[in-house]
Amino acid sequence: MSHLIAPSLLASDFANLQKECEMINSSDADWYHLDVMDGVFVPNISFGIPVIKYINKHTLKPLDVHLMIVEPERYIVDFKNVGANILTVHIEASKHLHRTLQAIKQEGMKAGVALNPHTAVEQLEPVLEETDLVCMMSVNPGFGGQAFIEGTYRKVEKLKSMIVKAGLDTKIEIDGGVTSKYARKLIDCGADVLVAGSFVFKSENPIQTISELKKI
């Protein structure tokens, strides 16, 4: 299977969200990546349920919703109701992670677990069978436009080995600082999904940039 590209709307022009959605619809992108931040788990506040409900009216591709919030289990049904197809929670923010992943799946969504850069992939082992997607942060979460942490490669290789050994088809997603400079090596290490924000939306031709990432 070819790798997937998920442009992150955190880096988009919020004053022209409908146009940004139409651009992604017409591109080679596979998913929309939506970062929800609460100003508590991460030091920033982005957008939430009402904005995603609006975005969903203009999208033709799956919504990959990444919750950077405390107590994510409180909002599972709310995000399902506004169109989330994949719902990812942070291992660092979930007290009862196994229960939360089961609840996400019961609502018909794919269940994802995100890891901050300092979190060891071995912590995923108890819930790996319940996890459809692992979102590996390659920057410290909270702000777009940060530099890629190159230690991510080793973590991807280790996680891929765990997935293969367990006989699972869990996808590995890389989120943070992704550009064409890092994409090929990430894919070779085992990444399945590349989230790209500033690299796409700040480029002169976002559609072409997405296409180039897809062809790598």
Model region roles, listed by residue range:
Residues 92-94, 116-118, 139-142, 198-201:
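Short, acidic/turn-prone active-site loops that include or flank metal/cofactor-
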Residues 101-103, 119:
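Predominantly soluble domains enriched in secretory-pathway, periplasmic, or organellar proteins
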Residues 1-88, 93-96, 103-106, 111, ...:
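Conserved N-terminal beta1-alpha1 strand-loop-helix module at the mouth
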Residues 4, 114, 135-138, 173, ...:
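Conserved beta-strand segments that form the floor/walls of ligand-binding pockets within enzyme
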